[in-house]
Amino acid sequence: MAIIKEAVVATFPDLVRVIQNGADRIELNADLAAGGITPSKGMIAEAIQYVHDHDKEITVMIRPRGGNFVYNDIELKIMEADILETQQLGADGVAFGALTDENTLDEDAMENLIAAAGGMTITMHMAFDALDHEEQLHTIDWLTDHGVERILTHGGDLATPIDANINHLKELLAHAANHIGILPGGITSANYETIAKTLTVYQVHGTKIVD
């Protein structure tokens, strides 16, 4: 099975470059220095048109700010509105995540956001990596039960090399048991084939996934 290379971009020139260099799917962000936040409506619209013209798929990041993933009611309203707008513009999918002050999945918030995203694929983004191990396993089950398609994870702190997180990623994959996709993040063009083979996954994600 061919490996799906999901490239993270935040500018239109980068979008064009990664499509030309073999990206299969796009995750569109703004402000990667902040870890990626929701792009502008204009950027989303132009990116969707370009990606679809090239017969690829696009997921849009829904995140109102950098920092943690604990959101107040107003921020959650913003996220819901951004999801609905992204849906109207024709995106294939959205990526989001919300946690509680106790560092657990904010299930109430996630239910509302998932409902708003009807008709699009949903990715739980790297907020997942902020959870402890037991909560990650519970979250995999909860997301599976609520129709989320995949979970983006580095398997540990983003500063750690992916090789150091292989065993943890294998545990997550075993627990997911193919009921939900585990999308390894922080992967590069230099290591994606090795990582995909080691983990037996068919999709990988990163800002440097294509040259």
Report the location of each language-model feature:
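Glycine-rich phosphate-binding active-site loops on the catalytic face of alpha/beta enzymes
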Residues: 24-37, 85-102, 146-161, 187, ...
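N-terminal entry module detector
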Residues: 1-32
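A short, flexible beta-alpha/helix-coil linker loop
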Residues: 32-33, 65-67
